[in-house]
Structures are given as structure tokens and as C-alpha cells.
Amino acid sequence: MNIGFHILNDLTCILIKNFTDVPFITSDNPAFLTNRYYFKKDLLKYFSFGLNSMGTLLVLPISPEYCFLAYDKKVYFIPHNRGILKVKKDKDIEFMNQFQILNCNDNIYLNSTSSFEKYYEKYLKLRLASRHKITYSVLDESTYKHKRFKVIPSSDLKNYKDSEILTHMSTLHSRPDIWPSFLHWNIRGYGFSSNSGEGHVREKFKETLDPKYVHRVKI
């Protein structure tokens, strides 16, 4: 509990109140993490995002009428009133619901199928076949100063039984089909990077980056 609080206590937390006829749905894997900033910048070609990333969005449906949302205010602006956001557009609720389809393990829970059937098939096609990618690298060169590894396909591992091997696993994320109308960019938004596999992180995690290369990045 304390570890989670330390990681996320710089995020802004609000409740979304649903004023539409489309209820929030939930699933056997209801909490989801996404990042509009990473998708906008096409950063997933280089690294995945996590809980420390610049542009974090965390969503958890609570009931058909309410949904919890935590976001990086250094990247996004959401016009809520004292922590409550009233949503009156069906498409905004559809944004939240699509992730229950994309992220669920086996089951989706809902109190009405009328609106759900309209977009279920569309988002079902966007589900990833796998949620993780594993990359293998074998030792290619070694000196007293450094080691260099080269990436190989998994089918070649049998040829390197006696070699030093690095295994890297990254999380794959479904790309949303739509984004909600209430999620605006903070025009002064920023984060930090050191051009490393850490990616772009929030200011809170700036100290985890190599101080020689850390620099500020804008949205």
C-alpha cells in the first residue's frame, strides 16, 4: 500500500460521474493503465510505459455511474469541479469501456447489453494476442571497458547455449480507438528523459535518470 502511494501520489485523482444512458462496465481485470502522450509521440517503438511515466492515465470503474481516474497534470488538463467530472457524452463513456474489452482476462460484467453490443465487436478486434514481448541478446563483444550484446531471434537460442544471454521483457499496450473529449493537453506540459530505456518520466522520478544526460522534454 505504501509503495503504491509513493509511486502515484503526484497524480491528480478525480471521480467521473456518468450522466449518459451508457453505463460503465467492468471486468475481471478492471484497473487499466494507458498513456496518450506515449501514443502521440510514438514512443512505444523504443520503450514501453509504466507507472512512473510522463503522461500516465489510470482508470478504474467503480459502478455503472462512477469511475475513478488518476492523471498526470503536468501533461493533461481536465476541467473537473472539486474532484468531480460530469460526463454527458456517450463517446467519453465508450472510451472508458473499451479498455474493459481490451484488458479483460475472460469475463466482462455489465447491467445492460443494449449499448454494449454496438461497440463490443469493434474493440474485440483490437485485443492484443500477447501482452508481453521478450527480446534475447547474446554477448557479441567484451573488453575491459564494456560488453556489447546483439539481439537474436528466439529460434536461434539453441545455438548459444554456452553464451552470456540477456533477456528483456516489455509490456505491450493496446492503442485506444478513441480518446475522451474532456482530456486536454497541458500546453506547458513537460517531463524528463535521459535518452535511455527508462523512457520519459514524471518529475517525481527525475532522480532515477542518469544525471549526466537528464533533460526536460515538452509534450
Residue locations for each model-derived region?
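Alpha-helical structural context detector biased toward long hydrophobic helices
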Residues: 1-219
